[in-house]
Amino acid sequence: MANNTKTNPKGLDVVIQNMQNLLYNKLTTLWSIELNGYGRCYPSFNQEQNRKEIEFYSGANEYKDVLYAEENKFFFTAENEIERVGNSQFKTKVELFFIVNVSEIYPNITHRADEEVRVDVINILEQSSFATIGSIVIDIDKVFSKYEYIGTDDLQPYHCFKIVLDTLDYNINNQFCN
């Protein structure tokens, strides 16, 4: 499992990669599980399956569908309008998705530990200076409402949820050097 980062991101992708690195480093330590972290992923239309999907650009014009892979993961999308707030300063909403096996994260808890998982993520995000939490979506029909996913479920041991984040003002010229 890996933290799949962009090489030398700019602007909004710097904000996303900073959150991605923070979450990946803290959660892999806290949960002691294999976890895949993805930065900004992109909607695409799969003509063979006749559905809108979420894909991660893996390089060389190749994309990876992030929803159907069997793994613990989180990823971001940024499909909202980007608002200009000043010279080179912008803000937007970013969606952060989690698909995890709660039994792997908390094997000694006998009840469904979905709330414990969300609390861990929220506590880490609240330490961040990159965004604020706008809302948390746990209804599976609403988590992936923009996408036509059939058969995606939220039954034990799996848990899917989405956090809508409001980015703090960021400079579009910011760069992140790996």
Feature roles, as predicted:
Residues 34-39, 112-168:
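Acidic-leaning, charged glycine-interspersed low-complexity segments
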